[in-house]
Amino acid sequence: MGGGGQPRESGEPGSSPAVYTWEEVQHHSSRNDQWLVIDRKVYNISQWAKRHPGGYRVIGHYAGEDATEAFTAFHPDLKFVQKFLKPLLIGELAATEPSQDRNKNAALIQDFHTLRQQAESEGLFQARPLFFLLHLGHILLLEALALLMVWHWGTGWLQTLLCAVMLATAQSQAGWLQHDFGHLSVFKKSRWNHLVHHFVIGHLKGASANWWNHRHFQHHAKPNIFKKDPDINMVDLFVLGETQPVEYGVKKIKLMPYNHQHQYFHLIGPPLLIPVFFHYQLLKIMISHRYWLDLVWCLSFYLRYMCCYVPVYGLFGSVVLIVFTRFLESHWFVWVTQMNHLPMDINYENHNDWLSMQLQATCNVEQSLFNDWFSGHLNFQIEHHLFPTMPRHNYHLVVPRVRALCEKHEIPYQVKTLPQAFADIIRSLKNSGELWLDAYLHK
C-alpha cells in the first residue's frame, strides 16, 4: 500500500506522507534494514541505529515493530529526542491499520498509557535530590570508615574482614546508585545524569558507563527474551526457563551437567560473576570499542584505591583485599539481580505489549526498610521495569494502581518474601536442569 515498502531516510519536502501496512513494516527487521513505528509514524533507522545513544542493539530489537511504549518508557524528555526522529520519518501507517501491531490488546495499552499520564501529572517522575545525596553520602562514609579503621587499628584479620565487608557494602550501594543515574531518573537534564553516572560507576566502582548502558537497556527493552536480553545469555553454563533446556536436550548438547546446575551455581555464579567475568568483559569492551573516557574513569578508581591501601597492606595485600571485596559484592549482586527475573518466564520473542512483557518476566519482593536498602529498591522491579525513568523513591506510590490494572486485565502480579525469592532462583535452575535431562535421555 502506498510506499510499496521502498526504504528511504525521509520524505521529500511538500510531498504527502507515504503510507504503509504493518505487514510492510514487519518485513524490515533485519540487521541492515530496520524500520519501526512510533505513534503511527514509520521511521527508517537502518543507518541511524549505529548512532543511537542507547546503542544500536536496543533500538534494533524493535525493528519491524511498534516501539511507541518503549520509546516513551526510555526517554524522559520526549520533545528533545523527537528532533532526532524527524530526518528518519518515511511515512505513517495506513488509516485502515490498527495503532497496535500483532493483535495486541488496545484497551490494555490505553489503560497503561492513562496510568502513566496520571503518574506524570502527580509528579511521580520528579526526583528528590536529597534522597540521592544521602545515598551517595552513606557510600562515601562507608569507604572513609573502612580506610580509617585499618589506618588506626591496624590490618589484623578482624579489621581486614570488617574493612572488606564495609567496602563490599559501599560497592553494592554504589551499584544501585549508578543504576539511578544510568536510567536518567535523577536530574531533569540528561547530560547531568550522564556526568554523575560516569563518576559513580567509573570512579566509585571502576566500571564502564557505556558498557552498562548498552547491556542494561537491552535487558529492559526485551527482558527474559533469548537473543535480545544479554542478562540471560549464560554462555552455555546454564540452561534457563522451560524452552531452552528442552532444545539443548533434544540436540544432545551437554556442555555442562545441567541437571546439577542448581548445585554448581553456588560455585561459579555468585563467586565469579564480578571478580572474573565482568572484569574480563569490561576490559575487553572498553579497549575494543575504544571507550577511552570510561577507561580513564575506571583507572581513577584503582589509582585512588591503591593510594589508600598500598601504604597499609602493600601491593599484594591490597590486590587480595580488592579481590575479596569483589567476591563479597558479587554474591550480593547476583542474588538480588536474579531474584526478580530468573524464576520467571524465559522464552523467545512473542511480541507482547509493554505491560504484559514486563510482568511475564518480572516479580516483586515485599517492601521493608531493609529490603528497600538491600536491593536498591529493586524489590519494586515490576514498577521499575514499567517506568524505568521514575525515581525509585516513588515506586511504592504507583504500586496500588499497577496492581489494580493487572487485576483488571487478569495479568499475574507476583510478590514474594526475600527468602522465597532467593529460594526460587535455585528451584528454577533445578527445574530447568530436570527438563534438560528428560529431553536429553528420552527425546
Curated annotation (Swiss-Prot):
MF terms (GO), sorted A to Z? acyl-CoA (8-3)-desaturase activity; acyl-CoA 6-desaturase activity
* Pfam families, per the entry: Cyt-b5 (PF00173), FA_desaturase (PF00487)
What is the E.C. number? 1.14.19.3, 1.14.19.44
Q: Where in the cell is it found?
A: Membrane
Q: Which family does it belong to?
A: Belongs to the fatty acid desaturase type 1 family.
Summarize the protein's role: Fatty acid desaturase with bifunctional delta-5 and delta-6 activities. Component of a lipid metabolic pathway that catalyzes the biosynthesis of polyunsaturated fatty acids (PUFA) with preference toward n-3 substrates and Delta(6)function.
Report the protein name in the record.
Acyl-CoA Delta-6 desaturase
Gene name tied to this protein? fad1
